[in-house]
Amino acid sequence: MLAIPMTAAQAYNPTGGTVYQLGSEPCLKGRFNCAVYPKSAQLPSGRLVASFEKSTVVTATGSADRQTLPIHKSDDDGTTWQPLSEVKAPAYLSTDPRYAKYTSNWTNPFLYVLPERVGDLKAGTLLLASVVSGDDQYYKEHKSADPNWTPSNDGDRGDMAIALYSSTDDGVTWQVVNVVATGGWQGGSAGAVGQNIASANKYKQVDPLWEPYLMVHRGKLVCYYSDENDYIGFDPATGVPRLDPANDTAKDSHGQILVHKTWNGKSKKWSEPVVDIAGLTEDMGGGKTEIGGGRPGMTTIVPTADDKWLLTYEYWAGGANTRYRISDDPLKFFRGSPTGMGVDALPVVAGSRPLAAGGSPVLVRLPDGRLVYNAAGSGNVWVNDSGRTDGVWKEYQTTSRAGYSRNLQYVEGTGRIVILNNQGTSTIAHAEVDLGDSAGAYQQLVNRKTGQVIGTGNNSTDANIGNGDTPDVALEDAGAAADPDTQYWHVVTKSGGGVTLLNKSGGRAAAIWTGNATAGQRIGQWVDDSTTGTWTVVRSTNGHVKLQSVRNKDLYLTGASADAPLTLQNATTDGSQDWKLVR
């Protein structure tokens, strides 16, 4: 038996803060999306690194020329963040003439730590894949014509491509590795597709590349990405798309497909692209058709516990705008449906809503096999405990509100998820969420009066989701729960003082249900987002403690009788407010 075994506060900040806030400096595009698309990775040292698009006007050039991607770091498990470095465009990091046209390191960073050696790249190397480009000619032309002009949306950059960088010193310095794939003109994509066209874009082309996603598979590095080049179809045997011979000059389809390339880490070039999601086939007239209708985009992909692969993406041709596909082989998604199924078709447990839609889906696999999903339409996440493609999903609240391009980062060392999010007017925010089974000791809290322990009636998620919007924390016989984890709790010290009880089954806090700290109020599971679930530990006798409400110091956590719901009550000496923590 332990008196008060607690988890340290240093690496826990559930409500989070700000990584970056746009100031008054001018932007190359609309201010609402001037800073967007945060992504992160964890290094072997434990450091977290993050990057995001920051499309402010480069002071030295007055344009997008010399734009960089910022790298920020956290050395305390995501609790605080500081600037670390800036990754320059290939033209300014390399003297190789092949990279001279790529003068802007623009957007869609994807950070990835190599889990094994790939060719000349050692295990543990930090990689960055990003969208690079030439200057924004639409911006330059409009500023030249009217110095007072202010952009309100995306512009038109030339020479768009996806570049690969590496760092061997935890993100401090960077080298260009190579160019993964090339596109053409941006053409206003994706906020003003085919509208914001520069005069220099003679044929009004819209052929950018977007959203790289890296992983290692069978000894090779794989880069998934979104491709707006114009393709007239693909080889059904190999999945290799057929580029329109008039891609650079013909009327643009404004379509997009999902593809991937592979690289062995030694060869000069990556493989040919292979289709993952082709989208609809569109009639371009004159007997020509092109794939890419519906603009599938933003690949995320994970292995599942039943030896399959689950891919999620956004889709804009009507019906479900956030979709998924399942494959036995992560390199052969082209063999299935060109449009996939809506994520709302995935099974959920009672009380949980269908998986969020709204585009920009994010999917991660935790070390224990659980799958975690989020999309732009909700601040909540959905967890598949089995990790199987036929597993059911359960909804959990988070402290990070809904937003475009959120990022979910599992943190080795805490077992929690750090969420990065674009909020409001180009604010990159961070928060943390506990989804259960996080690092540290769990204990049962035994009530002195009844001998029973604190449980949740087998509910593992927020009580408003999993218990019919009714508080669920109550006394139970030890070992009586069908899900044993629901009777175990972290006692976590908070940075502002006090402790929180976080349940092992889902990481939810034992909190005052109404938020009003008055006598008689019940206790229910809720995401750890306020002081309603924070307690002051007061030592009692014989190894017991009392848990005093931080919100109202006259009230204590109380189990009045056997099987009773937990409530807040004024101080009493009958043992109903005394608790012993037992492993």
Spans of features found by a protein language model:
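Low-complexity, intrinsically disordered Gly/Pro/Thr-rich segments
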Residues: 405-406, 412-422, 561-569
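Short, glycine/acidic-rich beta->alpha junctions
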Residues: 206, 293
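Hydrophobic, lipid-facing positions within transmembrane beta-strands of outer-membrane proteins
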Residues: 36, 107, 160, 210-212, ...
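Beta-rich carbohydrate-recognition and catalytic domains
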Residues: 12-36, 42-104, 113-203, 216-290, ...
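Secretory targeting and sorting signals
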Residues: 1-11
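Repeated scaffold domains used in trafficking and secretory/extracellular systems
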Residues: 38, 295-300, 355-362, 402-409
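Lectin-like carbohydrate-binding module/patch detector with strong preference for beta-trefoil
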Residues: 439-583
